[in-house]
């Protein structure tokens, strides 16, 4: 079953600021996650226990998403450089209950 991709409004702004190259890299990984969003190794903890991450190692970027199994939605809540965990702090503020 394939999930539907949604963006938090602030995450969409962050997405649009990315270079086309980074967008393409994330698109490729997101396409796989839409088929199987619950990747154990990518699961976050603490305040973000309902979220998962996608990492672009060389670029140093992170994408944090939340999964709603009832509605079959993968919601991108934040993305950006890992710089001092700012992307994770943004994700904490934007999570849906």
In which residue ranges do the predicted regions lie?
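Conserved catalytic core of Hanks-type protein kinase domains
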Residues: 17, 33, 66
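Enriched for short, Lys/Arg-rich terminal
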Residues: 2-4, 13, 58-62, 66-97
């Amino acid at each position: 079953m394939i999930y539907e991709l949604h963006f938090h409004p602030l995450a969409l702004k962050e997405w649009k600021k990315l270079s086309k190259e980074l967008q393409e890299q994330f698109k490729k990984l997101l396409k796989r996650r839409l088929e199987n969003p619950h990747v154990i190794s990518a699961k976050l903890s603490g305040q973000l226990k309902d979220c998962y991450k996608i990492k672009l190692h060389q670029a140093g970027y992170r994408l944090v998403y939340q999964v709603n199994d009832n509605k079959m939605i993968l919601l991108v809540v934040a993305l950006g450089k890992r710089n001092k965990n700012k992307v994770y702090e943004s994700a904490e503020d934007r999570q849906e209950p």
